[in-house]
């Protein structure tokens, strides 16, 4: 008997995993715990699926994804917005766990995203540290916003919490520094990125950990991945304004901050920025173009293993 090629969608929740198989229509659920993941792997190994698709769900998908990948099964984690837009485009407006699993299986069959190797244990640890740092930064910002208009007693409490958060952020920065510098490859890439005026430790490490494709893609591909590639909005004879959209939001935010610094202290980006302003571009558009240019430079540096000084002459 010849196995029928199949595609699997898995909807991930805190309590359980809902699984749908296409084209057979088979559906079942398992607990999202160690025993449930073992059952999931065993059943899917028997099916020999062409592709398994899950949504990114803030880390709830990690144990299942790791187990599936370790078992040699082709698994991909996709952006939830992309999956939901696909479901709407196919006419599925209702939303339940079972329906979402079925939509993900359909997505796997039609779109066929390419599986990528899972990051190694050290990369996952570094990403976890960076993610925790982002959480603490958000908490500190919220507390700083609460300072205005509060009583003296509350102000003292908030300031004490901010001081504690500052200490924890500093500790995480030290942990990131120690872990990253312990690896020769990470250390080399970190040094290459930080050699560029405007790219500091936080920006460099965010790019390395949240944009691992940096240095492996073309400049058009990396710009689209981050969300700084200008997108057309044309129809007939109408030529609409170019805009940026989508991509990895946190990477784009950090790159924006690095670009702001680069427009002041990086001679190449500063000159490019000034030329755009003289040409009549508004500052927001000019900064976006500088983000695109800076990202292109960083991508080329990692691809060709060249320092900033060499890259500056080449550009």
Set out the residue ranges of the language-model regions.
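Phosphate-backbone recognition surface of nucleic-acid-processing proteins
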Residues: 201, 206-279, 283, 310-315
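Helix-hairpin-helix/helix-loop-helix acidic hairpins
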Residues: 144-202, 211, 266, 270
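Short linear capping/connector segments at secondary-structure termini
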Residues: 120-124, 153-157, 189-191, 236-241, ...
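A residue-level signal for conserved active-site and pocket-lining positions in enzyme catalytic cores
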Residues: 104, 136, 255, 280, ...
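Basic, amphipathic alpha-helical segments enriched in Lys/Arg and hydrophobic/aromatic residues
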Residues: 278-315
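Phosphate- and other anionic-substrate recognition elements at nucleic-acid/protein interfaces
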Residues: 1-167, 263-264, 285
């Amino acid at each position: 008997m010849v196995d029928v090629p199949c595609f699997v969608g898995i909807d991930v929740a805190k309590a359980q995993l809902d699984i749908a198989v296409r084209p057979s229509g088979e559906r079942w659920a398992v607990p999202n715990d160690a025993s449930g993941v073992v059952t999931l792997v065993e059943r899917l190994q028997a099916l020999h699926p062409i592709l398994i698709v899950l949504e990114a769900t803030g880390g709830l998908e990690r144990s299942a994804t790791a187990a599936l990948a370790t078992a040699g099964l082709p698994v991909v984690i996709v952006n939830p917005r992309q999956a939901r837009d696909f479901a709407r485009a196919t006419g599925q407006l209702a939303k339940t766990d079972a329906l979402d699993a079925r939509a993900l299986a359909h997505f796997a069959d039609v779109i066929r995203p390419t599986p990528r190797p899972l990051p190694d244990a050290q990369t996952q640890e570094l990403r976890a540290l960076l993610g925790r740092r982002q959480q603490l930064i958000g908490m500190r910002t919220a507390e700083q916003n609460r300072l205005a208009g509060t009583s003296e007693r509350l102000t003292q409490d908030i300031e004490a919490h901010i001081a504690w958060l500052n200490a924890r952020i500093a500790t995480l920065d030290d942990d990131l520094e120690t872990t990253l510098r312990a690896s020769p490859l990470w250390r080399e890439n970190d040094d290459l990125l930080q050699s560029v005026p405007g790219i500091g430790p936080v920006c460099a490490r965010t790019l390395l950990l949240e944009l691992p494709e940096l240095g492996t893609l073309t400049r058009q591909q990396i710009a689209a991945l981050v969300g700084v590639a200008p997108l057309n909005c044309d129809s007939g004879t109408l030529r609409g304004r170019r805009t940026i959209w989508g991509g990895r939001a946190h990477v784009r935010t950090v790159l924006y901050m690095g670009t702001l610094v680069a427009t002041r202290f990086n001679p190449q980006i500063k000159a490019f920025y000034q030329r755009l302003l003289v040409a009549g571009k508004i500052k927001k558009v000019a900064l976006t173009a500088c983000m695109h240019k800076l990202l292109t430079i960083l991508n080329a540096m990692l691809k060709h293993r060249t320092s900033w000084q060499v890259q500056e002459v080449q550009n």
